[in-house]
Amino acid sequence: MATISLTAAQSLGPLKVIIYDCDGVLIDSRRSNAAFYNHILERFALPPLSPRQLDFVHTSTAQEAIDHLFQGTPWRAEAQEYQRVMDNRPFLSLLRLEPHIRETLGALRPAYHTAIATNRGKSLPLVLKELGLQALFDLTVSSYEVEHPKPHPECLLKILQHFQVAPAEAIYIGDAPVDLMVSRRAGVTFGAYKNPELDAGFHLQDHLDLLKILPGGAAR
């Protein structure tokens, strides 16, 4: 169920843009990410990801993840080059859509603009195509399209500028502390997905819950 205070709900509107993180919000990608980075680690004869390492790479850019995994080794630069050129497609079959996200996006549009702000890089278009989500977003901003990835607010600010809206006219839905941080830095209300520990403006356990708390129905 959705959990949101009446005061917080009233302060949301009127909204024009709904922005989503990708991994952990639109898609369950932990198995895919684990397989991707374990493949790279195996290539350099390193042990597979620990649970803590998986948590780190799950919210990082690929470059940040490789820097972290290969720190203290002589293969960091070589591993960076390998991840830049390797084919992501073998790992796409491990992705799963989060429940009801397609229905929610369909209900939001066209009343609201929809966008993605993510630290996922070159693989984002492949992911959206694989899962049939391309037509459900007006704008996507990956780590390849900003100079400073999250937690810098550039990705959200770029979306606000594109739609010519104020921070109060958008919300950002994420699942990790870095998403909360970037929302605060951009002045955008943050909604936490399946993470009740985050100090968010509202919490969602199911994407359909968003439709129950948006002010003014589908008016934009």
Where are the regions a protein language model picked out?
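Alpha-helix N-cap/helix-start motif
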Residues: 29-30, 94, 117, 126, ...
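N-terminal helical cap/lid subdomain that shapes the substrate entry/recognition surface
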Residues: 2-106, 110
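Secondary-structure transition/capping residues
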Residues: 48, 64-65, 77, 93, ...
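Proline-centered loop/turn at the N-terminus of a beta-strand
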Residues: 113-115, 189
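Asp-based, Mg2+/Mn2+-dependent phosphohydrolase catalytic module
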Residues: 1-16, 106, 121, 126-220
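Secondary-structure boundary/capping positions in well-ordered alpha/beta enzyme cores
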Residues: 47, 72-73, 111-112, 134-135, ...
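Generic enzyme active-site microenvironment
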Residues: 19-21, 117, 173
